[in-house]
């Protein structure tokens, strides 16, 4: 391509200033002669450090630099980097090493060309193209920046129009990316008229860590949406920094933030699964959605209820009992058709830590016109279970559960005082109404599916804690003046039925019960039976009287299976000999099958022969048990999640374990007696099972 003349008539590249750096003096001399033949103004230097000093002293003194790759004082690539950062001049590398990786390294470091020694004259004649290309791009950049400055002067200063600067910045950034590609292109282009050496040169801006931090601080001060290059430049106040530099850096910064946001948005959070779409309707006449909308149920409680009813385990349901209205379930009353099952949920209502003490609220208002709950007295519950159960139930996840409130019914008022309860897995402990003289100084220890229901106004006094294991049920019957065990009382498939007032008969076999479910707690005045032998079912408990000392006598060879016990006066011997037929004694203790953890203290109303087993408490009016032969029912062993807990007449306390039982009709209280003297009604005494 022919040389171009400028406006003054001087041919280009005549007089182009070239700096040659090489540690070989012979090579320097040859190159200088060849450059002079090309009519260039050549300057030679044998040290890279010296050449760098010359460039720093006179940045405008040279148009292009030719440097060797391998030099003793400084590597040619290092010199290339420093010149590109500080002076922004085109640099041509030369070396006898023609390996591709070395040539590629020079190109990556920003070299305009790579000459292989020995350098030919034709190559030196065309080095002026790199100077023209460099200055041509700088002229276009300068013109573009001038148009942006004019736009800034004519643009209104309101906030809405400030966003237009960002669009211009984007256009400028795309233009600069195209410019960088053209810099690497070795093809010749059309040259414009004019002297390129007369145009101004702008140094390249290096965004160091400190400079970038100032930029970020300015953007944060203005806000990412309101940050524009002009304001950022004013806040940074860095000499030599132009608005174009800030605009380009701002565009890159916004693209970076956008990529980060998209990356985080695409990652699903494994700790926050999507909320369940299931809805909780009404249960027992209680609309959970309405309660949640009115603020009576916390949202987290409603979510936990949804998970529970959908069959998913939940361990975080917390319903505080002091400052918020508690969740209540309506009493399940009336007859149930065959096959209709109780709906119960029993995930943790109040979750506590092991061995924690919690005070129960004294009262709580009713919700939605439903029967309210009577609160437990403000006494402390001591936990001594290794699994960390609290207050009664242990679910499949071994969660700690406290029954905050129990339902208040006329027949089962919760007003007793329990000082200490040691509750084992799957146990429900419920005091009965008017528990005047029921006192446990050391606490009761129900264990494994135990339902402990003291009688109403029974005058029940316990000085030492009994141990009730393997699913026993301790209960008494409805108030009656005298119960003469003269006839066979047979019960079949009855659940939660009150006992009859009184029955009289001959000296027959006594009470018979097999597989009872629930014996309601209603209080008792006296029990009296003759000295006839009695039958005790395999799942029963009995109270013995007038028997030889330390033994349980059954004259009719009635089998006494496991899970039984007797109420008596004083501490019994703690061995298996108590269950054999021996001589006579009148005082018995409450026994379990496996071991005895406590005993009953001597009672003041026991005579020397055991005709009267009186239970009384000083300073209170109480009744007494006269004679024994009283069968006490036992819950059937149905495994976890099978047992009902009932208080009073048909009142159901929902629990985790009331899921699969079928409730029998509870209103038909027929008391008909067959020809054989047996009571034929299946709904007497609250026993469940078949003869």
Swiss-Prot record:
SMART domains, per the entry: REC (SM00448)
Record PTM text: Two-component system major event consists of a His-to-Asp phosphorelay between a sensor histidine kinase (HK) and a response regulator (RR). In plants, the His-to-Asp phosphorelay involves an additional intermediate named Histidine-containing phosphotransfer protein (HPt). This multistep phosphorelay consists of a His-Asp-His-Asp sequential transfer of a phosphate group between first a His and an Asp of the HK protein, followed by the transfer to a conserved His of the HPt protein and finally the transfer to an Asp in the receiver domain of the RR protein.
Comp. bias (Basic and acidic residues): 139-155
Region annotation (Disordered) ranges: 139-204, 616-647
Compartments, as annotated in UniProt: Nucleus
GO function terms (MF aspect): DNA binding; DNA-binding transcription factor activity
DNA-binding region: 199-258
Highest taxon listed in the record's lineage: Eukaryota
UniProt GO cellular component terms: nucleus
Comp. bias intervals (Low complexity): 616-628
Keywords from the named record: Activator, Cytokinin signaling pathway, DNA-binding, Nucleus, Phosphoprotein, Transcription, Transcription regulation, Two-component regulatory system
Principal cellular location given in the protein's record: nucleus
GO biological process annotation, one example: cytokinin-activated signaling pathway
Domain Response regulatory, chain residue ranges per copy: 17-132
Chain positions with 4-aspartylphosphate modification: 68
Record Pfam families: Myb_DNA-binding (PF00249), Response_reg (PF00072)
Similarity remark: Belongs to the ARR family. Type-B subfamily.
Function statement: Transcriptional activator that binds specific DNA sequence. Functions as a response regulator involved in His-to-Asp phosphorelay signal transduction system. Phosphorylation of the Asp residue in the receiver domain activates the ability of the protein to promote the transcription of target genes. May directly activate some type-A response regulators in response to cytokinins.
Name of this protein: Two-component response regulator ORR21
Native species: Oryza sativa subsp. indica (Rice)
Gene: RR21
């Amino acid at each position: 391509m022919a040389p171009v003349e400028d406006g003054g008539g001087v041919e280009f590249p005549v007089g182009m200033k070239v700096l040659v750096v090489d540690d070989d003096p012979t090579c320097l001399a040859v190159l200088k002669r060849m450059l002079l033949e090309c009519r260039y103004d050549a300057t030679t230097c044998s040290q890279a450090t010296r050449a760098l000093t010359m460039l720093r002293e006179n940045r405008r003194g040279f148009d292009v630099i030719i440097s060797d790759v391998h030099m003793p004082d400084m590597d040619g690539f290092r010199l290339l980097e420093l010149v590109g950062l500080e002076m922004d001049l085109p640099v041509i590398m030369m070396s006898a090493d023609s390996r591709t990786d070395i040539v590629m390294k020079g190109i990556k470091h920003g070299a305009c060309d790579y000459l292989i020694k020995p350098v030919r004259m034709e190559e030196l004649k065309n080095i002026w193209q790199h100077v023209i290309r460099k200055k041509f791009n700088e002229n276009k950049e300068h013109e573009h920046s001038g148009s942006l400055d004019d736009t800034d002067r004519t643009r209104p200063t309101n906030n809405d129009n400030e966003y237009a600067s960002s669009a211009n910045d984007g256009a400028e950034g795309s233009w600069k990316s195209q410019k960088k590609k053209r810099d690497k292109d070795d093809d010749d282009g059309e040259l414009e008229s004019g002297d390129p050496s007369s145009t101004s040169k702008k140094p390249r801006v290096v965004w160091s860590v400190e400079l970038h931090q100032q930029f970020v601080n300015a953007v944060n001060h203005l806000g990412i949406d309101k940050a524009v290059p002009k304001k950022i430049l004013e806040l940074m106040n860095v000499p030599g920094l132009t608005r174009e530099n800030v605009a380009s850096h701002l565009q890159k910064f916004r693209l970076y933030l956008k990529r980060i946001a998209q990356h985080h948005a695409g990652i699903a959070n494994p700790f926050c699964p999507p909320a369940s779409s299931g809805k909780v309707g009404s249960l027992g006449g209680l609309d959970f959605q309405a309660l949640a909308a009115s603020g009576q149920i916390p949202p987290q409680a409603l979510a936990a209820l949804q998970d529970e009813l959908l069959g998913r385990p939940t361990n975080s349901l917390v319903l505080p009992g002091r400052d918020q209205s508690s969740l209540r379930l309506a009493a399940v009353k009336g007859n149930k058709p065959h096959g209709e099952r109780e709906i119960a949920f029993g995930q943790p209502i109040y979750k506590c830590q092991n061995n924690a003490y919690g005070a129960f609220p004294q009262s709580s208002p009713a919700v939605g016109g439903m029967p309210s709950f009577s609160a437990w007295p403000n006494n402390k519950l001591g936990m001594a279970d290794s699994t960390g159960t609290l207050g009664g139930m242990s679910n499949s996840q071994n969660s700690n559960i406290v029954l905050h409130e129990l339902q208040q019914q006329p027949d089962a008022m919760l007003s007793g005082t329990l000082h200490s309860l040691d509750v084992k897995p799957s146990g429900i402990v419920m005091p009965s109404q008017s528990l005047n003289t029921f006192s446990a100084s050391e606490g009761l220890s129900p264990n494994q599916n135990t339902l402990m229901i003291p009688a109403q106004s029974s005058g029940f006094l316990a000085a030492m804690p009994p141990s009730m294991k393997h699913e026993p049920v301790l209960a008494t019957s409805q108030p009656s003046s005298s119960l003469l065990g003269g006839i066979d009382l047979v019960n079949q498939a009855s659940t939660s039925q009150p006992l009859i007032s009184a029955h009289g008969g001959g000296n027959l076999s006594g009470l018979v019960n097999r597989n009872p479910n629930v014996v309601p707690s209603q209080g008792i005045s006296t029990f009296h039976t003759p000295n006839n032998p009695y039958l005790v079912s395999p799942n029963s408990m009995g109270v013995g009287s007038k028997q030889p000392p330390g033994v349980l006598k059954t004259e009719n060879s009635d089998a006494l299976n496991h899970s039984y016990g007797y109420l008596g006066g004083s501490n019994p011997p703690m061995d298996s000999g108590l269950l054999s037929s021996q001589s006579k004694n009148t005082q018995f203790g409450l026994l379990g099958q496996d071991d005895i953890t406590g005993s009953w203290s001597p009672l003041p109303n026991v005579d020397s022969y055991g005709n009267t087993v009186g239970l009384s408490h000083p300073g209170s009016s109480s009744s007494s048990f006269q004679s024994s032969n009283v069968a006490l029912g036992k819950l059937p062993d149905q495994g976890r999640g099978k047992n009902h807990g009932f208080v009073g007449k048909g009142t159901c306390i929902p629990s985790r374990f009331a899921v699969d039982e079928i409730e029998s009709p509870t209103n038909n209280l027929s008391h008909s007696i067959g020809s054989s003297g047996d009571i034929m009604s299946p709904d007497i005494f609250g026993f469940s099972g078949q003869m």
